[in-house]
Each structure stands twice: as structure tokens, then as C-alpha cells.
Amino acid sequence: MKRFLDCTASDFENMKKKELLEAISASEGRVLVCETIGILQPMLGDVTNAEFVASMGADMILLNMFDVNHPVIQGLPKTEDREVIRKIKQLTGRPVGINLEPLEQGKESSVETNEMWKLSGGRVATLENAKTAVEMGVDFIVLTGN
């Protein structure tokens, strides 16, 4: 297996979970993950922040605030909802993951926040959302607490 750092975009297209983990491991801690928030205005106008961080050296891209039911990535060309992740992967050539947030039953959010940052149903760590994310093409899921 190649080290992650020696892989090309076409290598990532065909990688399965085990191969991706082995490639990361073989890179001995030299893989950089960068988190972006797709609902925010892009730093470069019509270029997504995911593309921007990839151009700056991010090896893997983590999308925060990504709602699997209502995906929004500012700066992305018109794309069907279920194809948003695949489009980001195509544009960046990088593995792409999302954050999902565990939530206690009966709670709407893990923190008090304003409406913009309020936890939506498509961002909660549920089996259904994880399955939807995988169907959309995510390479990894991070369980997080914002």
C-alpha cells in the first residue's frame, strides 16, 4: 500500500476503508486534516473553502455543519443534494468526511447557540444520518461536539 502522501486523486477514488487507514498509518503522522464550514461564504468568491484548503496543502477535508438532509457548500456549482460530497471529492481530489454530533435523547442541541449554529436533524449522529452520509460518498465520519 502507498503512503497517503504518495497517493493521487485517482488512488483515493478507489480506496476502501482498510486501504485508506493503511495509507494514513504508513505516513507516520504527516497527514493534515482541515475542517471547513460549507454554510459560510467562501474566502475566494466562487471557489469552495474545501478547494481553497486543498490548494493550501490539506490532505483530507472535514466538513463541519454539514447537514446530510439539506447539504450546503457555498461556492459549489449547482449540484444535486446527494452528489455534493462526490462533487467536492472531484474538485479537490481529497478524501472528504463530515462531523456528526451525538445528542442526548430529548435535547435539541448540546450547547446554547443562535439560530445559525443551531443543530439541525441532518447533523445529528444517528445511524440513518451515517448511512445517508456513506451513500453520499463520505470517506470518514467524525463524532464531535460543537
Locate the predicted segments by residue.
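Alpha/beta enzyme core
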Residues: G45-N69, Q74-L76, S109-N146
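A generic, well-ordered mixed alpha/beta core segment in the N-terminal half of proteins
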Residues: F66, E80-P102, E108-V124
